[in-house]
Amino acid sequence: MLYVCFMNSQFLILNFIAKGSKTFGSQFSTLNLIVWSPNPEIFNIGNFTLLWYGVLFAMGLVLAGWYVWRRFNEFGIAQRHFENLIIWSFLGIFLGARLGHCLFYEPEYFLSRPIEMFLPVSIDEMGNYFFSGYHGLASHGAVIGLMLALMLFKWQSKLAILPVMDWMAIATALAGAFIRLGNLMNSEIVGVPTDVAWAFVFPVVDELPRHPVQLYESLFFFVLFGVAIVLFKKMNYERVKPGFYLSLQLMMIAGFRFCVEFVKEIQVGFERDMVLNMGQWLSVPLFLLGVVLMVWTQKCVKNNENLENNE
């Protein structure tokens, strides 16, 4: 019932956003539009540049890690396990996000230049490598990479993994909120043109008013994180079994991502000929995985699974 209500609210919100221009747009002139053109750089020292995206990305990961650390302490799990979890998670998130972008969105380019998948370099016209930083991280790839990393963490630590995955899933929403704010500071992953009253103009893209989808997603993630921690505080594992929060987060995030893609500009050219874009196609299996995990964990997992192997 909780899931159905939440999904209905997602649909109503996205429907309001998508149709807002028909209802409200004509009431506002371009003077009401928000022209969004921040400097993505915080400061430069020599060749070093500190970007807002990097700072917000790091803030999201640190705060998410802090939340998981609190749960480890609450359940009396040894500190060494948390330290190992951080290492595995970082590798899974980074490699998954990077490879996800390279293989899902630009496979032809990166398969011909595999070194650029892993190293922050590019090749110039003369065939020489130069430092260019990493350009392109895919959130779906990050989710897949993180889940694989958690499986390796389970193999190494022998911990009951479902509670850990629950905590990581809750924390992921917090990290995602800050990452989308970083995208906003970079004026990237923009929405489709619109005339809704809250439209943003991104001068680095064009002069068209667009849906600020980065804000939509960031606000959704903040709300989802808040709802999840309230549910966890009220129910913990007394009324639900381990795996519940993981399943719920997968369904909510994938469901919202599928919906918001309708007002998001396509990321790569080949998506123009697709019925659904790449983000939507990748969201479908994650949503179905959440459904399967919800049924399996709540019917088959023991209630005391979260208390095993915690030394």
Which functions belong to the PLM regions below?
Residues 3, 8-311:
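Hydrophobic, membrane-interfacing alpha helices
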